[in-house]
Amino acid sequence: MEKSNNLDESYIKNLKSKVWELLKKGEVEEADKIFSTELDIHEIMGTWNWLHKILIEPEDTNPISIEYLIKKGVNPILKDEYNMAPLNWAMGNGKNIEAAKILLKAGGDPNLADKGVREIPLYKVCYMKPFNKELLELFLAYGGDIYKEYKRYGTAILGKNLYEHIQNNRLALFKDTGEYLFEYNKDIEKYGKDYFINKHKSLLKDEADSLLHEAVIDFDILKIKKLLDEGYDKNIKNFLNYTPLVKAFSICRLENLQAMVEISDLLYAGTTDSIKAFIIRLDEWLDEYSKF
């Protein structure tokens, strides 16, 4: 019996290696056949899910597989033993921009720091060379916070936050980023924190988003009520298989909490794993916020 178990373990191990290779190459149809019959796509392996696993070497991971796994309900914001979510792995040295974009739109936290406070997705965007203005604007639109402070250990870094860090480290690497963030900071000081998000709100929208998805992007309670009164389906899904409620959770920040409560009351149709994951994250943010 023990020999049989060992054979089973070896078979499963080889099967996982095969699926890993298929996902790395974007051969999702073949991978799906195996997940449908022999492997659990939602399995947690140690502290990793399949998104973590295929992003260990991010540069050669096909973004099609990232989208496939998210559509299948694999948690895109799960933190591993290093306090890293899939977005952190995707942005390791800025190696997989397309995968990062998908994970960001799936709710990835651009400000999440690993335990060593070295692998922060937003920082990685700012370190990229050549400067990628489009990607930086996308990260800022999805909640990237250049003023967020981190408790650092080990080597000291000039500046208490990303903005100060880049302004104080006057390196050629940061020239374009520094100039962009300097103007960004001026706009925030002049017009307020919501100015940039409102200016670039179109970045939060996708072609497959319904009118109801677009209404939650604006956290527009009156429009949501109107659409529901007109018979819009609260369970309609976008390209990531996100309902309007899950979409709202994925872009929600602490400043939207009151509106989020109202949206939940209007759109709630049963708790899903995605909703649970985002609620846990909001609880963590509230706990972190209360310490300052």
Protein language model features and the residues they cover:
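Ankyrin repeat A-helix N-terminal signature
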Residues: E21-G26, K53-T61, W89-N96, K124-F131, ...
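Alpha-helix initiation and capping sites
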Residues: I12, E27-V28, D40-I44, E59-N62, ...
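Ankyrin repeat domain, specifically the short helix-to-loop turn at the C-terminus of the second helix
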Residues: F35-D40, E67-N75, K101-D109, E137-D145, ...
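Ankyrin-repeat and related helical/solenoid repeat scaffolds used for protein-protein interactions
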Residues: G116-A141, D145-K148, N235-M260
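Ankyrin-repeat boundary/"N-cap" motif
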Residues: I12-V19, E43-I56, K79-P86, A113-C126, ...
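Conserved ankyrin/ankyrin-like repeat signature
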Residues: E30, S65, E98-A99, E134-L135, ...
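Intrinsically disordered, low-complexity regulatory segments in ankyrin-centric signaling systems
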Residues: M1-E38, H42-E59, E67, L171, ...
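Leucine-rich solenoid repeat scaffolds
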Residues: I146-Y191, L245, F249, L257, ...
